[in-house]
């Protein structure tokens, strides 16, 4: 079962300024925490469309929210297809869209999914079980240079070269098949003093591989642009990020769409295509409260940004 503790629940949904008869999209259904709170605020005229690429999450939510009937619609898809899937449902604009970019706890805690460095399991890390690329492929087939690049760019790992060298040397004799084997190689690549600080030594590399397997940053960037297009004037987009790379994409995208570019002086009016699309609701990100951090350790790196369509 999905017993995912939802992060920044009220702040994210309340930040959408819910209209009871509106149409909303939860791009990251997961355990259904945000969806549950959002549905409770809708009248019969309102509806929620929820995306997830995980079949278990979809089935769980269908059971959990069956009493809402046609007000609750699930879409088994990556949110990169947001606009296409909504158009298939005959929806061309919505009142609000939310993204929670954390890996849901059940995925982390299901050993066989291979997301966690705490369990020994096959190297998988696919959010979508029908996708072809796995963590096994990345670790065993990608070149030393490719591994260094993703460890450094996606994981911000200082010892990227040393870890990639350990992986390269090991796989000359034997394929790296499990998360446990990979964790040991990562530890060998990090000097002992550094292993004792900054959390689990495998955290950054596992994050990097997960992002690469699921093409997460490119997918999010495309989906966020789609969300901005799909939201009605006065509608909002709420985004929870969990690491600096995602937050940078969100911050940059919101900023670019909420500012007027440098135009020639003396223009009598600003052409429509240069008018800002968004108004920032949060100048600085909203962070979890101390109480929430005590109750849910996984919330510590969460940041919430909200913008409104002009």
Curated annotation (Swiss-Prot):
BP terms from Gene Ontology: rRNA base methylation
Alphabetized UniProt keyword annotations: Cytoplasm, Methyltransferase, rRNA processing, S-adenosyl-L-methionine, Transferase
SUPFAM superfamilies the record matches: Putative methyltransferase TM0872, insert domain (SSF81799), S-adenosyl-L-methionine-dependent methyltransferases (SSF53335)
Broad class of where this protein is predominantly found: cytoplasm
Location(s) in or outside the cell: Cytoplasm
Disulfide topology: none
Positions annotated to bind S-adenosyl-L-methionine: 32-34, 52, 79, 100, 107
InterPro entries tied to this protein: RsmH, SAM-dep_MeTrfase_MraW_recog, SAM-dependent_MTases_sf
A Pfam family of this chain: Methyltransf_5
Gene Ontology cellular component annotations, sorted alphabetically: cytoplasm
Catalytic activity: cytidine(1402) in 16S rRNA + S-adenosyl-L-methionine = N(4)-methylcytidine(1402) in 16S rRNA + S-adenosyl-L-homocysteine + H(+)
Enzyme Commission numbers on file: 2.1.1.199
GO MF, any single term: rRNA (cytosine-N4-)-methyltransferase activity
Gene3D superfamilies assigned to the protein according to its UniProt record, in alphabetical order: Putative methyltransferase TM0872, insert domain, Vaccinia Virus protein VP39
NCBIfam families xrefs: 16S rRNA (cytosine(1402)-N(4))-methyltransferase RsmH
Family named by the database record: Belongs to the methyltransferase superfamily. RsmH family.
Role according to the record: Specifically methylates the N4 position of cytidine in position 1402 (C1402) of 16S rRNA.
UniProt-recorded name of the protein: Ribosomal RNA small subunit methyltransferase H
Organism of derivation: Bacillus thuringiensis subsp. konkukian (strain 97-27)
């Amino acid at each position: 079962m999905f017993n995912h503790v939802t992060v920044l629940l009220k702040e994210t949904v309340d930040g959408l300024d819910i209209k009871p008869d509106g149409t909303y999209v939860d791009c990251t259904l997961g355990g259904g925490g945000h969806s549950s709170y959002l549905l409770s605020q809708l009248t019969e005229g309102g509806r929620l469309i929820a995306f997830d690429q995980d079949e278990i999450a979809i089935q769980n939510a269908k059971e959990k929210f069956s009493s809402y009937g046609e007000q609750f619609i699930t879409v088994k898809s990556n949110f990169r297809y947001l606009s296409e899937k909504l158009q298939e449902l005959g929806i061309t604009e919505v009142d609000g869209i939310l993204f929670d970019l954390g890996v849901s706890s059940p995925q982390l805690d299901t050993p066989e999914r291979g997301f966690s460095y705490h369990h020994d399991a096959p190297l998988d890390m696919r959010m979508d079980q029908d996708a072809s690329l796995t963590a096994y492929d990345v670790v065993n087939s990608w070149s030393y240079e490719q591994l260094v690049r993703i460890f450094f760019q996606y994981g911000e790992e200082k010892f990227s070269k040393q870890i990639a060298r350990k992986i390269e040397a090991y796989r000359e004799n034997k394929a790296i098949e499990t998360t446990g084997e990979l964790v040991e190689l990562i530890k060998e690549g990090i000097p002992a003093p550094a292993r004792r600080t900054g959390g689990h030594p495998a955290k950054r590399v596992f994050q990097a591989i997960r992002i690469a397997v699921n093409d997460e940053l490119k997918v999010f960037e495309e989906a966020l642009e789609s969300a901005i297009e799909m939201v009605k004037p006065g509608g909002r987009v709420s985004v929870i990020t969990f690491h600096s790379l995602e937050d940078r994409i969100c911050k940059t995208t919101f900023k670019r769409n909420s500012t007027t570019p440098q135009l020639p002086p003396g223009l009598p009016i600003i052409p429509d295509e240069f008018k800002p699309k968004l108004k920032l609701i949060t100048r600085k990100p909203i962070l979890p409260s101390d109480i929430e951090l005590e109750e849910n350790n996984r919330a510590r790196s969460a940041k919430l940004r909200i913008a409104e369509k002009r």
